[in-house]
Design a protein with these regions (language model features):
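Conserved alpha-helical substructure of the radical SAM core
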Residues: 19-123
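Pocket-edge positions in alpha/beta enzyme catalytic cores
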Residues: 38, 70-73, 98, 127, ...
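Flexible mid-to-C-terminal extensions adjoining Fe-S/redox cofactors in radical SAM and related proteins
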Residues: 287-362
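Glycine-centered loop/turn positions within well-structured domains
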Residues: 56, 159-160, 287, 313
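N-terminal [4Fe-4S]-dependent radical SAM core
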Residues: 2-4, 9-47, 57-59, 87, ...
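Radical SAM enzyme [4Fe-4S]-AdoMet core and its adjacent flexible, acidic
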Residues: 2, 18, 27, 160, ...
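Radical SAM/AdoMet-radical enzyme domain recognition
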Residues: 75-94, 102-222
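A short acidic, helix-capping loop that chelates divalent metal ions and anchors anionic groups
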Residues: 66-69, 158-166, 228-232, 314-316
Length: 362
C-alpha cells in the first residue's frame, strides 16, 4: 500500500513498503545495446529532479509558494530507478530541482550514486545544478561524496539586480560564497547559468563576461524558454545567441571553440587571450533537438522525454505496483521510443508543457 508521509525537509515523501535495495542490485549489463530513440539518438544523459521545492522565487520562474507541489521519492527509491537507467546505458546523471540542496540526504544520495558503474565499468559522471544559496557549507561534502561537477544558477552579478530577480534579501552574497567554496573544493569546471530576459537582466551580459575571467568560471547564457509558471514569455523578451555574441564581442573579442561532443547544448567561446570561457544555450533561436541525448525523471518518478512534452510516463507507478528491474527496463526502452523529434516553440499551436521548469527539473 502507498503511504504519504511528511519528510524531515517538509516536502511530501512517497514511501513504499520495501527494503532499501543495495547498489549490487543494479549490475551493469554489457549485453544491452545503447538506449536509442526512434530518431536514432543515443540517450546517455539522465536529469533527475529530487525536489520541486525552492527557496528562491525568481520572477521568471515561480508565481507560487516555496513548498512542494509534487511528492518526492525516498532516497532508496531514487537509487533503484536511477540504477535501472544506468543498466540501460546512462553514463551521466545530473541532480536538479527545484533546489536539490534542500534535500537533507543529498550528500548521501551522491555518495550512493558514486558507487554505480556504467556498462563500460566506468564511474558515472555525476553533476548537480543548484541556486547556490546553501552551497558554501555543502561544496566540500558533495565533492568528498563523489560529485564531479556543479552548475550554479545566477542571473546577475550585482546584488541589487540579483535580489530583484530572486526576491530573497541577501541572496547574492550567499551565492557568491557558494561559488567560491565550490571552486575551492575542486568541483570543476564550475559553470554559472544565467537566464537572460530583455528588460530584466540583459544589462548584465558584459559584466558576466568579465566575471567569467575574474572568477575562473564558465558562464553560460540561456535563452529564456516558455517554461515559467506565469505568462511572462514572449518572443520579444528572448535575448538571442547572436545578440549575446555581438555585444560581448564589442567589449572583449571572442573565439568560438569546437564542440566536445555532438550532443553538447552550448555553443562555446573563449576570449581573445584564451582566459575564461562563456557558453550560449540557444534552444529558441538555434534549437539543438537533433542531437538530444537527454531524458528526465521528475521528483515524483515520472519520465519526461522532452522539456516541452505534454505527456508523462509513470515509472514510479510501476515500481510501486511491484515491477521488477526487467519490467522497469522494458518500460523505459518503450518510453524512449516515444521521445519527440523536436520542440515547437514559436510555432502556431505551441502549448507550454504540463509542468513549469521548477516542477520538471532543469
Amino acid at each position: 500500500m502507498l503511504r504519504l508521509s511528511a519528510g524531515s525537509e517538509k516536502g511530501i515523501r512517497l514511501k513504499l513498503p520495501m527494503a532499501a535495495p543495495s547498489i549490487s542490485a543494479f549490475p551493469a549489463q554489457a549485453s544491452h545495446s545503447p538506449l536509442t530513440d526512434s530518431h536514432g539518438r543515443v540517450i546517455h544523459d539522465l536529469r533527475v529532479s529530487i525536489t520541486d521545492r525552492c527557496n528562491y522565487k525568481c520572477v521568471y520562474c515561480r508565481t507560487g509558494e516555496v513548498g512542494a507541489q509534487y511528492p518526492e521519492l525516498a532516497l532508496d527509491e531514487y537509487l533503484r530507478l536511477i540504477g535501472v537507467f544506468v543498466a540501460l546505458g546512462i553514463t551521466k546523471v545530473r541532480l536538479t530541482g527545484g533546489e536539490p540542496l534542500l534535500r537533507r540526504d543529498v550528500v548521501e544520495l551522491v555518495r550512493e550514486l558514486s558507487r554505480l558503474r556504467t556498462l563500460d565499468g566506468d564511474k558515472l559522471d555525476l553533476a548537480l545544478t543548484t541556486n547556490g544559496h546553501l552551497l558554501e557549507s555543502l561544496a566540500q561534502p558533495l565533492k568528498d561524496a563523489g560529485l564531479n561537477r556543479i552548475t550554479v544558477s545566477m542571473d546577475a552579478v550585482d546584488a541589487a539586480t540579483f535580489e530583484h530577480i530572486t526576491r530573497v534579501e541577501g541572496s547574492y552574497a550567499k551565492v557568491l560564497a557558494g561559488i567560491r567554496a565550490a571552486r575551492a573544493a575542486g568541483l570543476a569546471p564550475l559553470k554559472i547559468n544565467c537566464v537572460l530576459l530583455r528588460g530584466f537582466n540583459d544589462d548584465q551580459i558584459e559584466s558576466f563576461a568579465r566575471f567569467a575571467r575574474e572568477e575562473d568560471v564558465v558562464v553560460r547564457f540561456i535563452e529564456f524558454m516558455p517554461l515559467e509558471e506565469g505568462r511572462l514569455w514572449t518572443p520579444e523578451i528572448v535575448v538571442t545567441l547572436r545578440e549575446i555574441v555581438d555585444r560581448i564581442g564589442r567589449a572583449l573579442p571572442l573565439v568560438e571553440l569546437p564542440p566536445r561532443e555532438a550532443s553538447e547544448t552550448a555553443r562555446r567561446y573563449t576570449f581573445f587571450d584564451g582566459v575564461g570561457e562563456i557558453g550560449i544555450i540557444a534552444p529558441v533561436s538555434q534549437a539543438f533537438c537533433g542531437a538530444c541525448s537527454r531524458v528526465r525523471l521528475t521528483s515524483d518518478g515520472k519520465i519526461r522525454t522532452c522539456l516541452f512534452s505534454q505527456v508523462e510516463h509513470d515509472l514510479y507507478g510501476r515500481l510501486r505496483a511491484g515491477a521488477g528491474d526487467d519490467e522497469l527496463r522494458a518500460y523505459i526502452v518503450q518510453t524512449i521510443q516515444e521521445k519527440e523529434a523536436r520542440h515547437h516553440i514559436g510555432e502556431p499551436g505551441f502549448l507550454k508543457p504540463s509542468r513549469s521548469m521548477v516542477h520538471i527539473g532543469g
